[in-house]
Structures are given as structure tokens and as C-alpha cells.
Amino acid sequence: MKAFPTFALLFLVLLFSAHVSDAQHWSYGLRPGGKRDTESLQDMYHETPNEVALFPELERLECSVPQSRLNVLRGALMNWLEGENRKKI
């Protein structure tokens, strides 16, 4: 009677491992091993010259309300202290 649960567990493990190991996806145009034919790649991907600028110029966004560096430092210090107080509680 003790052998039945062992064989049932072994059967389930083999069943699930076979399902996981049979998970290779075959796409159209793929050869076994995941290698594509180089001629078909050239046909699929045509180079598009200069459609998108590589490094667009960034706009500078400025705040309409000037803040002093002291206020920014004070805010950062207060946030840090609040975080330390939460850790202690």
C-alpha cells in the first residue's frame, strides 16, 4: 500500500516535467536550434535611413517659482528625518 502514493507522485512529477520540457516554440521561418536563414532576414528587415533623429535636442524646463537651494536642502533633510522616525516606530 505504501508503494501506490510513491508511484502516483512519481507519475505526477514525470507528467509535469514532460510538459515543461516540451515548451519550445516554433515560429515561421525558424530552423531547428533557433537559427534563421540569413536571406529571409534581409528581406524582412529593411533599413530605414534617418527616419528618427538619434539625439534630439532636449527642451529645458524651468520652474516659474524660483526655489533657493537652502529650501531644497531643508525639504530633503525633513523627508530623511521622517523616514528615520518611521523606522524607529
Swiss-Prot record:
Domain of life: Eukaryota
Coiled coil: none
Residues annotated as transmembrane: none
Segment forming the signal sequence: 1-23
Gene Ontology molecular functions: gonadotropin hormone-releasing hormone activity; gonadotropin-releasing hormone receptor binding
Cellular localization per UniProt: Secreted
Keywords from the named record: Amidation, Cleavage on pair of basic residues, Hormone, Pyrrolidone carboxylic acid, Secreted, Signal
Tissues where the protein occurs: Expressed in the forebrain from larval stages.
Principal localisation: secreted
Residues bearing the modification Pyrrolidone carboxylic acid: 24
GO cellular component terms given for this protein: extracellular space
InterPro entries, A to Z: GnRH (IPR002012), Gonadoliberin (IPR019792), Gonadoliberin_I_precursor (IPR004079)
Glycine amide carried by residues: 33
PROSITE patterns: GNRH
Function: Stimulates the secretion of gonadotropins.
Similarity comment: family membership: Belongs to the GnRH family.
Designated name of the protein: Progonadoliberin-1
Gene symbol of the encoding locus: gnrh1
